[in-house]
Amino acid sequence: MNDYYASINDHSICYYSMGEFVEVGDNYIGKYNGLNGYGFRVDKFEIVDGNSYCQKLNYTGEHGEKLALISITLRNEGSEEGIWLHDLSLIGEDNYVGMNWDLLLLANPGLEGSTGIRLSPGMEYALVIPFDILQRYFGRKTFKNIEEYPFFFVVAGYPEEQRIQLSLFD
């Protein structure tokens, strides 16, 4: 479905691998989130039990039965602006997975309660981005084998969509 949507729109999709640094360039994500000067690298991807992870963080709010945790390094090569993290997305071949903003803040205390971040030029910052995987949005068989489901971390949406292919086995 995501590929169909992309095919009827006039933009290209570029795929990257985990461990590869993706320079966003003049691309955008979200309506106002220009990312020129920023880059992303996915260092680790894991799918964990939601209850166990939330217990470690003493979090009692709503969360997915499972969580997709994307460990990234964010780098600023020369922008004076910041970026909104909540515009980043996790997609599959036919599904979008929502970010858990509460867990984002608990997993990254350095954000100090903000879902945006501004790095000084030349700086890097490591983050864990948590996404809720809710069984009701997947078929029973797909959810049972969610570790085999193809996920992509989208770091830019247009004019060029930039997707990092995620793997549990890297």
Where are these regions (language model features)?
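Conserved functional micro-motifs across diverse proteins
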Residues: 1-69, 75-170
